[in-house]
Amino acid sequence: MYYSSGNYEAFARPKKPEGVDNKSAYIVGSGLAALTAACYLVRDGQMKGERVHILEKGPTAGGACDGWKFENIGYVMRGGREMDNHFEVMWDLFHSIPSIETEGVSVLDEYYWLNKADPNYSLCRATEKRGQDAHTDGKFDLSDKGAMEIMKLFFTPNEDLQDKRITDFFDDEVFHSNFWLYWRTMFAFENWHSALEMKLYIQRYIHHIGGLPDFTALRFTKYNQYESMILPMVKYLEGFGVQFHFGVQVTNVEFDCKSDRKVAKRIDIIENGERGGIDLTENDLVFITNGGCVENSSMGSQNTPAPYNTEIKEGGGWDMWRKIAAQDPAFGHPDKFCYDPEQTNWMSATVETLDQRIIPYITKICKRDPFSGKVVTGGIVTVKDSSWLMSWTINRQPQFRSQPKDHCLVWVYSLFTDKPGDFVKKPMRECTGKEICMEWLYHLGVPVEQIEDMAENSANTVPVMMPYIDAFFMPRAYGDRPKVVPDGAVNFAFLGQFAETPRDTIFTTEYSMRTGMEAVYTRLNIDRGVPEVWGSVYDVRDLLDATVKLRDGKKPIDMELNLVEKMALKKVLGKIEGTDIEKLLKEYHII
């Protein structure tokens, strides 16, 4: 496997890999990484579909990329997906996946046309004082000291960030800024999370710094992530004859491990309550989704809280990974990520409006008609003075094809599930759907005397607790996640957010899909490049642009400097006078 960039590799079709007709594949899990691996097995690996087996413990495919209506409960979207135009692997695959809505076009075509015709941007990024605009006004509001703290992290070598927390690099100069309000609510970072991952995020999206305050950097699918992404992939795979095995719990993968050679020998399973297994040869390839951000997630209802279940049990991704990791140090250290759910949990809730009473309060804040079929909030609206640090968003409606035309679906999430609310004086994790809706309505500015009635009769709210949703953000060191293909691996690879691949950032669709592509390309030795992570961090234009925009348009040369620094700067500017360097610095408002 090798990385590439540019159209030469992107548009090429690889030859059929040698020996592929003698191989079979077993994929543990059916999330985005797993489905991506399956797609590349049949598309570029040209493996026969009937030789590809997807083992899924649940009743449907998709993993964390869900979207479902549960009978007698309501619509549920555990999360949402924010996409980037430089998700190189994602678009490499989705240009081949046919739309299930429009004949003759791809998922990428649909997505591209939609976001060109209806570009995303927010008209209100944050509120305070019960629905009033917090007037962040597109500003990061960073002091010179805060900007320098970010700069220091940006240039710190990865090796020096092992097991470090964000609090080791930032103080209140950053934490009290709009920058941190935007950042942690958009990406679900907490102050105690990994400094390494924080650095990787800044570098990965340096080309989008200017688009973070108003979300012009983002793009979204037409419907929820399940209907817009997962279903087309499933239909594509079914067309090749790929075998989906639902209700199959993988409890372990057994290996024969030597210092220089590691072979997967058996997959241990539970199916229909019976223990069994799949014996493997070296021609049987195993792709393992280890860990899981939505493991142990639980659902409540309008009148019941979502249980907070933290016990790791057999048959789930964490227990399986623990058993795998016990067999060889190269298979990672799962307990670095799942040891303390108090540091990794947050909650979401899906609110379905049932009439028009709530809509005017939404419209007042987002300044758009929620039923226009176009962008509504344009990303999350964060309630700046919320004790739960609540954010909410409304994507283009409808979010489900089955959704009533006069109903609006709102996604609400909060990072602090253990804090009492501002209206409902209970922690979010103890609240029913109705009570979470009441807290949200309070922050919309609904008159207090109308809140309970609206939450009960004008909305149906379904809460979801996810104890390990931020597990991948926990401080880590190299080796804590197994490489996608560990050294010496003969017939297996790891997939998903807890597999190690360089430069990319977790909690993204691209990361999952990248691990799937890299795993298949390595195991089948496919002779075509995997698109490298977009290299904006190496583009001086993006670096200069981000430097100015992070400081809200202020030139770096206007920072407070001592006499020696001023003299040095004057000398440097004199040296570049009349050169292309001077022109470039002026173009990007550095000088």
Question: Where are the language model's segments positioned?
Answer:
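Glycine- and aromatic-enriched mobile tails/lids
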Residues: 118-122, 421, 480-482, 498-510, ...
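Beta1-alpha1 glycine-rich phosphate/pyrophosphate-binding loop at the start
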Residues: 1-3, 37, 41, 45-85, ...
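C-terminal segments that line or cap access tunnels to active or ligand-binding sites in enzymes
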Residues: 207-221, 283-285, 290-515, 521-538
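Helical element adjacent to the flavin cofactor pocket in flavoenzyme catalytic cores
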Residues: 203-285, 290-291, 303-304, 309-318
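N-terminal glycine-rich phosphate/pyrophosphate-binding loop and immediately adjacent elements
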Residues: 13, 19-149
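Amphipathic alpha-helical segments that form well-ordered structural scaffolds
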Residues: 89-96, 182, 228-239, 435-443, ...
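Rossmann-like flavin
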Residues: 100-207, 219-220
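Extreme N-terminal leader/targeting segments of oxidoreductases
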Residues: 1-25, 43-51, 69, 550-558, ...
